[in-house]
Design a protein with these regions (language model features):
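N-terminal beta1-alpha1-beta2 submodule of the flavodoxin-like/Rossmannoid cofactor-binding fold
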Residues: 1-106, 111, 167-195
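Cofactor-binding loop segments of dinucleotide-utilizing enzymes, especially the Rossmann-like FAD-
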Residues: 8-9, 39, 128-131, 162
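Short, solvent-exposed amphipathic alpha-helices that sit
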Residues: 15-27, 140-153
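Short, well-ordered coil/turn elements that cap or connect secondary structure elements
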Residues: 29-31, 55, 119, 151-154
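Hydrophobic anchor at the start of a short beta-strand
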Residues: 34, 156-157
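Short, glycine-/small-residue-rich phosphate/pyrophosphate-handling segment
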Residues: 110-152
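Beta-strand-loop-alpha "switch" segments that mediate conformational coupling across diverse proteins
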Residues: 157-164
Length: 195
């Protein structure tokens, strides 16, 4: 199983990265091939609204550092998106990545019963960390993003949320957060029925 992990945090060694790394390490131990992309180290733009992916090509026409990431998702089985909450939402780097996934839709995706260019049955793990300990805050983030990926054909989707982590190291000191990351990896790596 091929896992593409997209880290949306500007802090390469922060809480978001720690939880994502724990998930990826557990998945590797279970046989996954893992590729990690730190978005903050890449040079790319968000969607330019040019519509070339609907009129000229079946991929995004922008050629930048995100090209490899988009192709890895296309070829992979599992997408891990990890983000801290910045100003009540995902980071701008992750948002720009999500915008660029628009190229996964076929031109007539509004009416086509098969709207995605991706192979169906991919799995999504959404890792959300936040400084706020109140779990009712920012609880809507995943519910806004998941429908996009369901339209792309992702069918086994998981939310891994860690609240109340501000300083680097906070997540690692919380055993339940690290256990949840490992347990989620076990669920994701479990054989899918019928395969």
């Amino acid at each position: 199983m091929k896992v593409t992990c997209v880290l949306g945090s500007p802090r390469a060694n922060g809480n978001t990265a720690a939880v994502a790394q724990r998930f990826c390490n557990a998945a590797e131990k279970l046989g996954a091939s893992v590729q990690i992309f730190v978005l903050n180290t890449l040079n790319y733009k968000g969607c330019q609204g040019c519509m070339a992916c609907k009129t000229k090509m079946d991929k995004c026409v922008l050629q930048d550092d995100l090209t490899e990431v988009l192709e890895s998702v296309r070829e992979g089985d599992v997408l891990v998106m990890a983000t801290p909450i910045y100003l009540w939402d995902v980071t701008s780097r992750l948002r720009a990545f999500i915008e660029r996934t628009y190229s996964y839709f076929v031109p007539d995706f509004h009416t086509n019963p098969h709207p995605s260019r991706l192979s169906p049955g991919k799995k999504l793990v959404f890792i959300q960390t936040q400084g706020q300990a109140n779990e009712s805050l920012f609880a809507d983030i995943f519910s806004r993003i998941e429908p996009i990926f369901k339209r792309y054909g992702f069918t086994d989707n998981h939310l891994l949320r860690v609240c109340g982590v501000r300083k680097p190291g906070d997540a690692e000191s919380r055993g339940e957060a690290m256990r949840l990351a490992e347990e989620t990896a076990q669920k994701v790596m479990a054989p899918t029925k019928g395969k």
